Amino acid sequence: MREHLTKSSRGCERRYCSSSSQNVRGAAQTDVVMTTSGLTSTTAELPVVGPFDLRDIAMMGFGHRDERSFDGVMRMAFCLDGDYERHVGVAAQQVGDRLELKVKSLGDPLSDTEVEALRKQVARVVSLDHDGEAFHQLCLSDPVLARIHMKAPGFRPALFYSPYEAALWSIISARRARSQGITLRGRMSELYGASFELSGTATLCVPTPSALLEIESVSGLPADRILRLHAVAQAAQRGVLDADRLGAMAPEEAQAELQQLPGIGPFYSSLIVIRACGHADAPTVGEPRSQAAIQQAYGIDHELSDAELLALAETWRPWRTWVSVMMRALAA
């Protein structure tokens, strides 16, 4: 196994990680692999309840993800929940009624607490933190939902890796084409973040909050966006962007708090809370593509008001978020 470290012009380390040798076992970890280069590997599993298809989730095309093919592995590289100061890479593969995770991390082996945090984070990202069978039954009870759901019964919402990364995406991608946002995220991650080789493919991870604060410029990003990224990093360091904390708050309360961050308005605060914290039943309004898909699916010949949309969504409880995402992704 090799770990290649190069210095950017700002003096930040860029980490590129590839494969391995020597096995070590830990109490809550299996197949841990360590080398003197400082890269550690381990494995973990997540149970699958209800219909679930990792391909549908990996290919959703959400945020920075823009996969054009699926080889059976969903590759994820992110800042670990908590203080977001540790990079990890995960290659996830569905095997029957479980998700197998091959994990790579830099530095010391992940502690038992960190392994559990990682499992919880991945479960949230691929929506395995909820009872998929209950969602399946709700969809079958509504002829309109059933027709759409059965196009891809294993589909579930793909989420941002964390509120921290959703906030970064909000700043980077605002008022520009999604493809441009993907390019800028990749550029920043390559220079100041980390890159893990996951099942033969290099996968980039955004900078940690401390590294983000060291950035003075990124080609293509205006100076005011850099200042906004610094504000996101500082918020993460204060615990404002903790996923559990935000997820425990009422969505509207969390959104109001996030709007105190420069560059985060109503739309992006909703994106962070609903699409990064794991809410399954937060009502979604003010999202034109979802609303258009809902109107088409139900044969509604006029533009729904927010009140009408909320009234219709009452029948989807406790899965209003999942239904809205499913409508947008599959209705066409």
Model regions: which residues?
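Extreme N-terminal basic, low-complexity initiation segments
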Residues: R2-R14
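HhH-family (HhH-GPD) DNA N-glycosylase catalytic core used in base-excision repair
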Residues: S9, C17, S21-R25, Q29-A332
